[in-house]
Amino acid sequence: MVCIPCIVIPVLLWVYKRFLEPIIYPFIGPIISRFWPTNIAVQENGTGDVKASEKSNGACKTKADVVVANGPSANGPATPISDKKID
């Protein structure tokens, strides 16, 4: 069994959106736009360091990549991992 607000609220929202908003919005739209201005999306035109972007090529090289490539034994003996919580 569905609760009453689960039926009534969507119906009221539909009635507002369909019938009341086209009548009310032209009057309150200018008032709302003063308080809540729309932000225009700005696209950057590559003003950053071009050489740095050419070198990186979109790949992130970290120290962890080197360890995986060389294997864990390249950095010395592996330390045992404890399953117990240490406070």
Swiss-Prot record:
InterPro entries recorded: UPF0729_C18orf32-like
Superkingdom field: Eukaryota
Pfam families membership: DUF4512
Family recorded in the similarity comment: Belongs to the UPF0729 family.
The protein's name: UPF0729 protein C18orf32 homolog
Species name: Esox lucius
